[in-house]
Amino acid sequence: MVEIYYDDDANLDNLADRKVAVIGFGSQGHAHALNLRDSGVDVRVGLPETSTSRAKAEEQGLRVVTPAEASAEADIIMILTPDTTHRKIYAESIAPHLTPGKALAFGHGFNIRYGLIEPPAGVDVFMVAPKGPGHLVRRVFVEGKGVPVLVAVEADATGKALDIALAYAKGIGGTRAGALRTTFTEETETDLFGEQAVLCGGASALVQAGFETLVEAGYTPEVAYFECLHELKLIVDLMYEGGISQMRYSISDTAEYGDVTRGPRVITPAVKAEMRKILDEIQDGTFAREWVAEDDAGRATFTKLVEEGKQHPIEQVGGKLRPMMSWIAKD
């Protein structure tokens, strides 16, 4: 069973004499920095002088310096920029200041898991990964609650890495809900698999295939959109709130019978075997090497595939239908 830590298991005193640098001020960066500050932690935000986020951070009363200056000052350096930027930021701004006794922290394990960043000996390496977007991490913190987090320690040079990680988790509100102990490997591999096979890749492909099946059979694209994309949120919300069983309890008997008898015909053993292949590529580094090479080469294939996806008929149909829905229509 997983170890779960709560407020009583974490002590903010472990951050009392430590300066924290949050590198980045995006979704997670702004939440971490503001929550830590409100928890009494000495925090600064590291952003390039050309960053448009500098003004946003300063407006929130945060001290903003360059990533290099933040890394030089801080005892704990948390990197919260996109994965593909980590290597450059680390090499140019962090590594020169990563002296023994400091801690390097991450919100996702990708670069450590695949050896893209190799911290020196004498440095603690830990991860605190909220299981929710930054705006939620900030909002519930202000409400006196918290979002669950994953906590992992990759290197414990000081013998205090877990204590520091838990203190950090408490500082952003994570231990109010619970901090689940994991590893960089487990967090990275399961996160990538979930994105690729279920949450993003799997769900997107399933929705498109269902839409195509109905339209090719002669049904109107607008009705197909409602049945295969729009109503997905209704089902996912039920699953999110109470699990699959609660979702099945909440739908009609006809829908439930179709679920339990036809669902396995869609997600067949062959589909599950393909999921296993995807997991294998994550575990053996194939996906990471492919993605890093694609990013380094300028993302031509990636961009092409994304643009092709935008041309799918379901996008045009949705663009026409969503303005009908006042609760989701955008200005």
Swiss-Prot record:
Domain KARI N-terminal Rossmann stretches: 2-182
Active site: H108
Ranges for domain KARI C-terminal knotted: 183-328
Gene Ontology CC terms, in alphabetical order: cytosol
Matches recorded under HAMAP family: IlvC
Cofactor note: Binds 2 magnesium ions per subunit.
Binding-site positions, Mg(2+) 1: D191, E195
Pfam family, one: KARI_C
Catalytic activity from the UniProt record: (2R)-2,3-dihydroxy-3-methylbutanoate + NADP(+) = (2S)-2-acetolactate + NADPH + H(+); (2R,3R)-2,3-dihydroxy-3-methylpentanoate + NADP(+) = (S)-2-ethyl-2-hydroxy-3-oxobutanoate + NADPH + H(+)
Top EC class, one word: oxidoreductase
Domain of life: Bacteria
Gene Ontology biological process: isoleucine biosynthetic process; L-valine biosynthetic process
Binding site for substrate: S252
Lineage: Bacteria, Bacillati, Actinomycetota, Actinomycetes, Frankiales
Binding site for NADP(+): F25, G26, S27, Q28, S51, S53, G134
Keywords annotated in UniProt: Amino-acid biosynthesis, Branched-chain amino acid biosynthesis, Magnesium, Metal-binding, NADP, Oxidoreductase
Family annotation (Gene3D superfamilies): 6.10.240.10, NAD(P)-binding Rossmann-like Domain (3.40.50.720)
Pathway: Amino-acid biosynthesis; L-isoleucine biosynthesis; L-isoleucine from 2-oxobutanoate: step 2/4; Amino-acid biosynthesis; L-valine biosynthesis; L-valine from pyruvate: step 2/4
Keyword Amino-acid biosynthesis included in the entry's annotation: yes
Disulfide bond entries: none
Protein name: Ketol-acid reductoisomerase (NADP(+))
